[in-house]
């Protein structure tokens, strides 16, 4: 995404903040997702290729072990135990090939990490993320499996190069939700709070828990852990089970790092310079007394908060949260009248289960395409036992070429009326007074090929979004948004906040398209 921090006038009078923004880059990643490496769907090759389309860093995660799976009190069906055992064994057999392919992915310009996963009723589920790309799996236990227990209790992420990241923490304790009583922030500098399971920022957070594993429970949330005094960075991951790291809408991580290099990203993990995103890369650079997110600040009686929020879509609200309470809320994001605009494009719809292969080009006359933000989704399959045709893994892709954008993808309708199966992207324009957006569509649907061209004058694009169908009613369609003024996508905050006790402050932002972003807190200690 094109980032022009000069739009924030307050940075000019905040030299240390301006220097921090200049010295750091915002990166997008997903370090917890699955494929057929253990149990799941889709090949590792496809997972790596999919990650390269829209992420800066990634991992593909193997299901590794479930130490207390045989707890009779939990009444786990035998077929569930069986596919877990088979998946764990499959991971061990394929680990060498996995490491080789993960290491080879570096040549594509993406930064890889190694990861595997423990399930646990007692501790909650953990993704074990490893910096060393030659990491071997732990040996099998001789008797009682204490490997996860030992990691959670004894690991020091700063020294070991291993992060124990709890995920889908919102489930009930004892039912694979987090056990805050066993949590160790030295072992776990990161906690995942958004994924395809839902959002666990707080008990009422948008994106409900709707998986078969159950609802959110009591204090098993980000705010619940913070209230206990823990300090951790927050992450989003897809937890996608169909070879689609970074699948749009399922959860992603935003990281502020000094560079797009493995060491810098790992340092950012350890320093808690992280954000949890549902989809779009909503960037929040913010400070208390000139100290950035993830840090601990000593104060007397007030906090000077400065924030700079840059979204890819119209913002609907931004909130400042202190110790679980919303203390500031911003809902006014007026157009600034600049020549920088944004648009959203999406294609899909049509009859459920009927594939449409798209080849789309968007060209612009009288304006310059400044940036493109992909919104690519993997096919949404959760059940490891579900049938899935993996004979042809079409890779969706978005390319920005000079003054045009090209999208190649397949859609097959929406699984339910509330499940988004579209593919698309956001793009920025630097415009002249008048301009034209041209959409060239090639689509193959129901055995027929359709080729169409649509032209939209800038005057039309100020009058609301457009919708076009390729072959009449309930055929696949595309949508091009109306013109979005860049002022509607940004916010600058400068606040003096009274502080009466030790605690934490963080930001959360909401876009009008439903995407959300949460920042890691800044912790406050009174002098």
State what each model feature region is.
Residues 1-527:
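Extended, charged catalytic domains and RNA/DNA-binding interfaces, predominantly
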